[in-house]
Design a protein with these regions (language model features):
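Active-site pocket-lining/capping segments in soluble small-molecule metabolic enzymes
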Residues: 1-121, 125, 139-231, 238-804
């Protein structure tokens, strides 16, 4: 069993030393731009270099996040930024953009690339593609399950998230914030609309339907280590240093215990910010958060309350007992009541209380532990009955002391090993060092003093005295394993000269160590070749409605998606009906026979390996029936690429050599589309979505849990502004897709886009009426100068140009 790397988030300079002291073996951080957490403090270039130097002295690796989609106009600046990071000694960069991977391989081939979780690498096809591109490590989606990870076969290192916030959507597959407020998660500016309450018609109470509990795999570290995971990652670049110190130190302690087969309690982790914990999809045990803010450690339930006293029945497993100055939160349905304990509470048994009429008290035994809280400091009185409420410990004074201790610890998880050798040369003191870093690199240094040894007037300096002075390491995070003193102890020199010699050597070792990670910086100039298309305009049409196939005219391609048989909000694992899929595609091919368009089977954008196996089986059977059909997929290896691939620059398009058509991201702006089309080697390869409901989220998390699924409800969410978001199920039965209820419509821009050089446009008719195919003619008329908005609104009553 290999103990994985512990990778900690660092959102500011202040957090770096905390992460190192707490036991991180690597950290990840971001510059002021191009990172997926733009609202963290983040680092200037000078601060990044300082952080890299500091971390390397402590044998801690530094990974810099450049994990946003990159616009055409940014490519050259980003590449020169990466060149500087490489020169500074960054151990790797985390990247989302396919085009950036291509450019790094070309211009900075020795810079290690880690594929960000934003790339949504959920299957072996994507891993194979990235391995061929020289990627060293892949951060797997948080949605991956233990068995799926176990079955992955790759030579790349695998990294998974084990702790922190969970996005409701697959990372990299969420356009909700972008389309609802212009702040793109793929550009690092997510406004977190998932943390708001939504309504579902048929269910009375609004709820945090899109807000999962935080992830914690603390109790599964042994299983993770046995999966040969190379790195475990803690989320939280925007969280406090208290969170960082407590979470990282607890995970370090737990990893160290793994070696001896022991386990440790996770209660302390619950006391720093969390929305409640679950194991997420790792063991398919996701839960919805009960509130948007901090929940804390659940300690029990209230069995009795009065104005100045609370009695809480403590959970049997609780070892963290609240103390004076700690904070409690009492939660009951949508109500909560928080306060600070002002007197030392008493822990006792029920023997000290009379059994009354309260049912909760009657259910207890006399040996049950109860916590009696006599007085509280409060900002307000409780406005609901506290009995039968859940009690959470949300603040722990003792933690502040532990955080302070970690801050001042000044140590690192792995120290470099130092061998010192002292000798005389022409009576001048000479000190040599051999420093072995954690990466097995050896650093050597030598310094010679200016003051010679002399015959003593009174007392000589002994070899033991010199050895004692050489043992002092000041601030340096080294571990001395051997000191050789080649001196007979008969001469004299001031001790201050020995100390000076030692300091000079340590300073030289520091410089040599830092220098050993550096590389040469080079200026990168990209070729911005202007290209043009052939001028012929073609339309594509997305559908999952066989009626559309009968009436569609004037389109070159039809992307056919198989609709789910069961479109409820309940999710089922691997619910694949192969006969249904075969029948649907076969019928579609029969209807399309003799039509002018090419029929293309659109696979789901999320395809875990078991689904790929099922889809390929369907394809094989169809081929035997002489019903072959080309494929649209997002697996980096197809003929037709959907907009879920987040294509935002010409380099990304050029990198997908096997694809005939690639759809650019729908969340870009007018100037971005102009920049892409002029710089792409083959503009006729680009397609652009101009009409339809955009997929805002793809998720493996349920919206409804338990008995909620038994109610009558409608398949859409409603936000506080009464906007509706239709919800549909993937053909896999394992994912839900949330669409925008307001359609994207670029009808008035279509002529401008054609003049820019775009020649392929797509219209999304999935889940639309039987006559939505008429939208094609509306757009063709617009290309001829006849923009008919009234006709558009017949089929698309609510529409927007979104970010365009």
């Amino acid at each position: 069993m290999r103990i994985p790397e512990l990778l900690a988030p660092v959102g500011s300079k202040e957090h770096l030393q905390v992460a190192i002291n707490a036991g991180a073996s690597a950290v990840y951080l971001s510059g002021k731009n191009y990172g997926a957490r733009k609202f963290a403090d983040n680092f200037t270039l000078d601060e990044i270099e300082e952080a890299i130097n500091t971390a390397h002295m402590h044998n801690v690796k530094v990974y810099v996040t450049v994990n946003t989609i990159i616009k055409e106009s940014e490519l050259e600046n980003v590449m020169n930024y990466l060149s500087k990071l490489y020169a500074m000694g960054a151990d790797a960069v985390l990247v989302q953009d396919l085009g950036l991977i291509e450019l790094i391989n070309k211009h900075l081939p020795n810079l290690k690339i880690h594929a960000s979780t934003q790339l949504t690498c959920e299957n072996h096809l994507k891993l194979d593609y990235l391995e061929a591109k020289g990627i060293k490590r892949v951060v797997l989606p948080r949605e991956m399950r233990k068995e799926e990870i176990k079955n992955l076969k790759t030579n790349m290192e695998l990294e998974i998230f084990v702790h922190g916030a969970l996005c409701y959507s697959y990372s990299g597959q969420c356009l909700m914030s972008s389309f609802k407020g212009g702040r793109s998660g793929n550009r690092g500016t997510c406004a977190q609309p998932c943390r708001q309450k939504y309504r579902i018609r048929g269910i009375k109470r609004p709820d945090y339907y899109l807000s999962p509990c935080d992830l914690s795999l603390y109790d599964h570290l042994k299983e993770i280590a046995e999966l040969n995971i190379r790195s475990i990652k803690i989320e939280g670049r925007m969280r406090s240093k208290e969170y960082l110190a407590i979470v990282v130190s607890n995970y370090r302690k737990a990893l160290n215990k793994l070696k001896s087969g022991k386990t440790t309690s996770s209660e302390e982790i619950n006391l720093v910010f969390n929305r409640g914990f679950s194991e997420g999809q790792f063991i398919n045990a996701s839960k919805r958060s009960v509130r948007a803010g901090h929940v804390g450690l659940k300690i029990g339930r209230v069995i009795s309350s009065s104005k100045n006293q609370l009695v809480i029945r403590l959970n049997d497993s609780i070892t963290t007992i609240p103390e004076r100055g700690d904070g409690l939160l009492i939660v009951k349905n949508d109500n909560d009541y928080g306060f600070e304990i002002s007197q030392d509470p008493m822990v006792t048994t029920l023997n000290h209380f009379k059994k009354g009429k309260n049912k909760q008290v009657k259910d207890l035994t006399r040996k049950d532990k109860v916590l009696v809280v006599k007085k509280v400091w409060q900002n307000r009185d409780a406005d609901f009955n506290l009995n039968e409420s859940e009690a959470y410990l949300t603040k722990r004074n003792r933690l502040a002391k532990k955080v302070k201790e970690i801050e001042n610890r000044g140590s690192s998880y792995v120290k470099s090993k130092l061998i010192l050798t002292f000798s005389l040369k022409n009576k001048l003191p000479v000190l040599k060092a051999r420093l072995t870093l954690a990466n097995r690199k050896e650093i050597t240094a030598e310094v010679t003093g200016n003051t010679p040894f002399e015959k003593p007037l009174k007392k000589s300096v002994s070899a033991d005295t010199i050895k004692k002075q050489l043992q002092k390491l000041d601030k340096y995070p080294f571990e001395i394993t051997q000191i050789n003193v080649n001196y007979d102890g008969t001469l004299f020199i001031p001790i201050s000269r020995i100390n000076e010699l030692r300091r000079n050597l340590l300073e030289k070792l520091e410089k040599e160590t830092i220098s050993s990670y550096k590389h040469k910086n080079k200026r990168i100039k990209l070729d911005n070749t202007v290209n043009s298309s052939n001028g012929t305009v073609d339309f594509s049409f997305y559908t999952n409605n066989l009626k559309h196939l009968e009436y569609l005219e004037g389109v070159k391609r039809v992307y056919l998606e198989i609709p789910p048989q069961d479109d409820s909000l309940s999710l089922k694992d691997e619910n694949y009906n192969l006969n249904y899929m075969i029948s649907f595609i076969k019928k579609a091919i029969e209807i399309s026979y003799g039509k002018d368009y090419e029929l293309i089977w659109k696979w789901p954008d999320i395809t875990h390996d078991k689904l790929i196996k099922a889809l390929n089986k369907v394809r094989g059977i169809l081929n035997k029936m002489n019903c072959s059909i080309p494929i649209m997929n997002a697996n980096f290896n197809g003929e037709y690429g959907p907009y879920s691939m987040n294509i935002a620059n010409s380099s990304s398009i050029n990198s997908l050599e096997d694809y005939r058509i690639v759809t650019v991201s729908p969340e870009l702006r007018r100037q971005d589309y102009e920049d892409i089309i002029t710089c792409t080697q083959n503009p006729d390869k680009i397609e652009m979505l101009v009409q339809g409901s955009v997929e805002l989220m793809k998720t493996r998390y349920p919206i409804l849990y338990g008995n909620e699924n038994k109610r009558n409800y409608e398949n859409y969410l409603i936000d506080s502004k009464n906007n509706r978001y239709p919800i549909h199920k993937s053909i896999s039965g394992e994912e839900l897709i949330i669409f925008d209820g307001i359609e994207l419509s670029l009808l008035e821009e279509i002529s401008h886009l054609k003049n820019l050089g775009y020649s392929n446009f797509s219209i999304d008719g999935r889940y639309k009426g039987d006559d939505y195919h008429k939208m094609v003619d509306i757009y063709k008329q617009a290309l001829n100068g006849n923009i008919n908005k009234k006709e558009l609104e017949k089929y698309s009553p609510k529409n927007t140009i979104a970010n365009y």
